[in-house]
A protein has these predicted regions:
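Helical element adjacent to the flavin cofactor pocket in flavoenzyme catalytic cores
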Residues: 118-120, 124-186, 190, 194
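Short amphipathic alpha-helical/adjacent loop interface patches that line ligand
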Residues: 6, 27-28, 146, 195
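Flavin-dependent oxidoreductases
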Residues: 10, 20-22, 26, 161-236
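Glycine-rich FAD pyrophosphate-binding loop
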Residues: 1-2
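Alpha-helical scaffold segments in soluble metabolic enzymes
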Residues: 30, 64, 141, 148, ...
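Short hydrophobic/aromatic beta-strand or adjacent loop that forms the aromatic wall/cage
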Residues: 49, 122-124, 211-215
Length: 236
């Protein structure tokens, strides 16, 4: 959802199947196209996701996860044994970013490039086609483009979907106490935690569940974590 979003994106997904990787690769292609067209008004970057561990067994799991991701289409795995071969992510922008992932198991290389993480780390996995953006800015940009092309924003509650022969024929909305039916052949459900409820209006029982996430913000007056750092996960 975008309500309390971390405003990050990734093509780094496990199987089974390549559905999520393929979906996100296509979505990232579209975001990058919009970023180019808008002079990157929504600040898309590709700093990556960084997974770190102090557990040698987890380092082996990193390698397996990266190999699986490569097989699913997330890009190649590069095992960095020479620090000169590691290419740090750009702090801004996305056009020169790598895909795939870099696995580093040399502590000296880790300390050079990521001096701000736990010095006990024995491995880091830097997934590359990942990053962050201003989701609100992107939303406003897309809304403006939609209006330029004749689209309208209409605020209402979806209370029903009419179908015939297995196809959508109209949507039923409620706004300010009025019930409105709009005929349409298509409906796009982008309802986040309400996806299962909305799909039920179509007679579809989606196998999805709402998972609670808790976000905590901590002040960093000493700038222990650089502003240009990747999104960091301590895997232990």
């Amino acid at each position: 959802t975008s309500d309390k979003s971390t405003e990050c994106y990734r093509n780094w997904w496990p199987g089974p199947g390549d559905d999520m990787v393929a979906l996100m690769n296509r979505s990232i292609d579209l975001m990058e196209s919009h970023a180019k067209d808008s002079d990157n008004v929504f600040l898309l970057n590709r700093r990556g996701y960084l997974f770190a561990t102090a557990n040698p067994e987890m380092a082996d799991k990193f390698a397996l996860q990266a190999s699986e991701a490569e097989s699913l289409g997330a890009g190649p795995l590069r095992h960095i044994t020479n620090g000169a071969l590691y290419r740090p992510a750009s702090a801004h922008g996305f056009e020169n970013g790598l895909d795939g992932a870099d696995l580093i198991t040399d502590k000296d290389i880790i300390n050079v490039h990521f001096p701000y993480i736990n010095p006990e780390a024995v491995a880091v996995l830097h997934a590359r086609r990942c990053g962050s953006l201003s989701a609100q800015q992107m939303g406003m940009y897309l809304l403006e483009r939609t209006r330029e092309n004749g689209g309208e924003l209409f605020s209402a509650e979806l209370i029903g979907v009419e179908t015939s022969a297995g196809r959508v024929t109209s949507v039923v909305l409620e706004a300010a106490g009025d019930v409105i039916e709009i005929r349409t052949d298509n409906i796009v459900l982008s309802t986040g935690p309400y996806m299962k409820v909305c799909a039920a209006l179509l007679g579809i029982d989606l196998p999805v569940a709402v998972e609670k996430h808790i976000k905590i913000s901590l002040s960093d007056p000493y700038r222990a974590i650089p502003r240009e750092a990747p999104l960091i996960f301590w895997a232990d």
